[in-house]
């Protein structure tokens, strides 16, 4: 039974999310497919996605798990959340989508229903740092007791040392609101963020704080109000050092394996630093990552977690085994500059082999290709027996310069595009709701749209398998004449060009995100 203080705290959190809910989005780094791919890279096989059991703790309206449920009809997906408002609306959306493999439950994680059984993938995103220690331990209890033997979980949380800078911003916003309250101002959730923004804008403009802190403060002002409210004004915001987080995990028979954002576990740093840290930390991967966090001022982590008993089965190392790399699927699209070089992060790629890899990936896009297949194609083209394709593929993955998947993805090309019926109701939700509470997302989580262009939605719904692009062009031209669709033209372009361009964009969007497979 939770103590009295925790119960009061839970009520405050519940009211906060009932009164000011987040828009519910899909987060790529939390998805079961991402968890599976990263662990496959480290030699650990997790359960098949197609019939997996998935749990999300703190699911909001379900926006993070609905796309997975849509794509995997044989999977069973459950979300729990404190906010009854969000759960009720989320279940209404699910019912309208006609989904029978997903349900949302209004439940406190401390009262988790043991009858829900084991899960292959557990997601807890944007929760852990915003609850007290008793609830944190309750979350870890659920993961320990309900994660299947070879399952994996995702936990995201704010981390030190990076968050120490941001605490200055949180403190000044809370200080200003408290000061104004004491002077008789009516401060509540509807205006707290507005006053808070004023405080950090003042700080950003006139403070003698160092540029790193100022940069972080300026970044806050660009965020949505609902994000600032829950990130900086919640009763709880408890960042942790990674080593502290892992200590809590070990107390529950769990371990931090790796960050879902691989760059945080395997950063691109000098050999000198790497050698010093290896000498200092040996095989202690958490200690090494903690040093990385100190060096690089990390403020947020997305830990992939599993049972401590699985540690010996996982190659937790920057040196990925070729046998584990061979079956990883990659895809990417790259453009050359006017001088004929690929440019990545403002750097011209002049290495011949890397350029050849980018050529092959771009030619194959939007289909995926295994690293093994990629290596063979490079060998065929450069006529050299030896190459560094595997090392370069790892570099691209660590640097987030290529999409990586555990399963092959093949785009379906059709003269008459047909949206898969399972996505029809999903698209219709965004057509009929001017203020959707979930974001439109691909099932991989690589795409999130808060708002979709109405013209694009109109085009996508015409992809029913009976119409060519030319047919759709003529239909839209007629709709524009009748005033049913408004086409906005930039100077120098015609409405016909705009329509054709939008049709091409929509076709690419549907195919690249596999909405027609």
Predicted regions and their residues:
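Conserved SAM-binding loop of SAM-dependent methyltransferases across substrates and taxa
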Residues: 61-74
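Conserved SAM-binding strand-loop segment of SAM-dependent methyltransferases
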Residues: 98-109
